[in-house]
Amino acid sequence: MADLHLAKSITLRCGLTLPNRLAKTAIAESIAPRNMLIDEGFHRVYAPWAEGGWGMVLTGHVQVDSMHLGTHTDPAVNADFSDDQIVGSWKVWAAVCNRHGTPTIMQLNHPGRQAPIGAGTSGVFAKNISASAVPMDIGSGLLARAVSKIVFGTPREMTVDDIGKLVRQFARAARLASQSGFAGVELHASHGYLLAQFLSAATNRRKDAYGGTPANRARIVVEIIKAVRAEVPASFCVGIILTAVHGSASTEEFQSFIEQAQLICDAGVDFIEISGGTFETPSMFIGPEKRGKAYDWDNQEAFFLDFAQAIRPHLGTVPLLLTGGFRSCHAMEAAVKRGDCDMIGLARPAVVNPLLPKTVVFNPEVNKSGDTKLHATRTPAPWYIKLFGITALNVHMDNAWYVGRLQTLAKTGR
């Protein structure tokens, strides 16, 4: 298996060397206690991933602001605790992750307008925050519109002071992660969360220095990267996850992405991960539609491979991590061998088998042909759920199997 491109090590710009090209990418664990710190449940979940032979493990998102959570069970930088208390909690987590030498990266996030009512300490009457006051659109039916209004509401546009506070929150969280023993952080600017809301012209309608042009919309992300770099050692890894956009290389949306990605590269990131989708259009779970047709699960994989191929020449030497839909060793090896991406990210298959690299991909007794399939469970929503007309609800019913698996592991250790 040593001749596989997937098995080759890679050294990131910060100097961090990953032993191979397989990354266990982020999936929300949904197991945090009410104090939002890390408990033994996280240790039980991450122990198998730590010994699984991954080149890199990315944690599920940790929210930088305890007032706003993506779910009621997200871990966060809790404002009620001191830096020492948070580091004390995170250090044990990092020690579990580092037990077998696997580089572990903490994903940092803020949900913005995708925070459901009551998630976090802001209170049920407080508005969500976003780049602009653009409400969620989770469906065209009356029920979908009602759910959107009740669960998410219309966010308020962030002030410049709010933006400065957010930059400091990301920088502080990164510093605490570094002090706790993590190898780096990944900034979450995908899946419709707050940083993605700033990057997108659809959700950022600001008229000030943080809106309008693609560069202005990326300004907050660039400022966060620079602020994080100022707080952590040069050897600390700083990555980012961005959203694949639709359309050909000639479209304005694609060109805007390239301009923003180049600014982000110049600001000093060590890798870029590509995924896709939002709560409104969750293509990270179901695959992107092509020409109006649903994703063909039987004959296609690698949801965002075409997009990765299109952007790869524009990213210079910054390594590209591609996540979403890979379900065979052959497809993963081919993507890296061709140079479409530098690393492959797996989330759902990593929940099914936390030891996947060791027991399957790099195991010559199992992966003899080089085209072994990866297992992932799909659980379509019942017909009566589909009647609600809320795509995200249908998809998250499918995702519930994986959440349940992690919750069971957190409780029992198996």
UniProtKB/Swiss-Prot annotation:
Binding site for substrate: 188-191
Keywords from the named record: Flavoprotein, FMN, NADP, Oxidoreductase
Catalytic activity: 8-epi-ilicicolin H = ilicicolin H
GO molecular function, one term: racemase and epimerase activity
Record-listed E.C. numbers: 1.-.-.-
Pfam families: Oxidored_FMN
Membrane spanning residue stretches: none
Organism superkingdom: Eukaryota
Pathway(s) annotated for this protein in UniProt: Mycotoxin biosynthesis
One GO BP: ilicicolin H biosynthetic process
Enzyme class: oxidoreductase
Binding site for FMN: 25-28, 107, 347-348
Gene3D superfamilies linked: Aldolase class I
InterPro entries, sorted: Aldolase_TIM, NADH_flavin_oxidoreductase, OxRdtase_FMN_N
Keyword Flavoprotein part of the UniProt annotation: yes
Described function: NADH-dependent flavin oxidoreductase; part of the gene cluster that mediates the biosynthesis of ilicicolin H, a 4-hydroxy-2-pyridonealkaloid that has potent and broad antifungal activities by inhibiting the mitochondrial respiration chain. IccE acts as an epimerase and catalyzes the conversion of 8-epi-ilicicolin H into the final product ilicicolin H. The biosynthesis of ilicicolin H starts with formation of the tetramic acid by the hybrid PKS-NRPS synthetase iccA with the partnering trans-enoyl reductase iccB since iccA lacks a designated enoylreductase (ER) domain.
Homology family: Belongs to the NADH:flavin oxidoreductase/NADH oxidase family.
Protein name, entry field: NADH-dependent flavin oxidoreductase iccE
Provenance organism: Talaromyces variabilis (Penicillium variabile)
